């Protein structure tokens, strides 16, 4: 039981550490001669995000390594009786990084940090929309309220329960974070919404 609590606490700590970042698509368009380079970097960040999203809970480190295209840097390792755990990090373009946590050789948690995505033109995340989101709603319900897809920033599979955290960002600041447990909203938070 102590081991289970320790594992749960460490995974909760990982989720709490998720940055305000979101999707891999960085919609900050450049001007003049810098635009092609910035677009290329945004495209690389989107590619990295797509790799992150395609990583499924329950796969092995070798499978994750194949998806990411390289070995990860080990950031944590422990062996406590019958529970072995290890965490790995991959650094991507423009400060983007992916962290994966394995228990007994199986992926249990993933997170991505360092990327941003803004609301599409004409869309905005508002306090009114935040207030419309209720516990128990599905992702599609939330997307319907907000008018666009959120960005998956973390996922944890623990004790037969799946927890996903998505972010929605405004172009001029402010964001909404929604946590889904087994496909239903279980918490939400916002910062600087009007």
Identify the function of each model-found stretch.
Residues 11-17:
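Secretory targeting and sorting signals
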Residues 2, 6, 11, 24-67:
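N-terminal, intrinsically disordered, polar/charged segments of Gram-positive cell-envelope systems
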Residues 28-32, 36-47, 76-79, 108-129, ...:
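Intrinsically disordered, low-complexity Ser/Thr-rich linker and spacer segments
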Residues 48-55, 87, 124-133, 165-167:
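Second-shell loop/turn segments in exported
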Residues 2-3, 110, 188:
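A general lysine-centric signal
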Residues 57, 61-106, 114, 135-194:
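A cross-family detector of function-defining hotspots
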Residues 18-22:
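C-terminal motif of bacterial Sec signal peptides marking the signal peptidase cleavage site
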């Amino acid at each position: 039981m102590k081991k289970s609590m320790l594992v749960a606490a460490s995974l909760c700590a990982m989720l709490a550490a998720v940055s305000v970042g979101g999707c891999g698509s960085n919609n900050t368009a450049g001007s003049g001669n810098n635009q092609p380079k910035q677009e290329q970097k945004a495209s690389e960040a989107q590619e990295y995000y797509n790799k992150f999203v395609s990583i499924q809970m329950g796969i092995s480190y070798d499978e994750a390594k194949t998806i990411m295209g390289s070995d990860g840097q080990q950031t944590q390792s422990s062996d406590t009786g019958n529970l072995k755990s290890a965490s790995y990090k991959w650094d991507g373009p423009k400060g983007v990084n992916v962290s994966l946590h394995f228990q007994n050789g199986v992926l249990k948690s993933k997170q991505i940090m360092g990327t941003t995505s803004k609301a599409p033109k004409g869309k905005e995340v508002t306090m009114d929309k935040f207030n419309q989101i209720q516990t128990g709603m599905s992702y599609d319900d939330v997307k319907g309220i907000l008018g666009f897809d959120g960005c998956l920033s973390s996922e944890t599979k623990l004790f037969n329960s799946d927890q996903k955290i998505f972010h929605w960002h405004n172009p001029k600041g402010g964001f909404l974070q929604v946590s889904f447990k087994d496909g239903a909203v279980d918490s939400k938070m916002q910062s600087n919404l009007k």
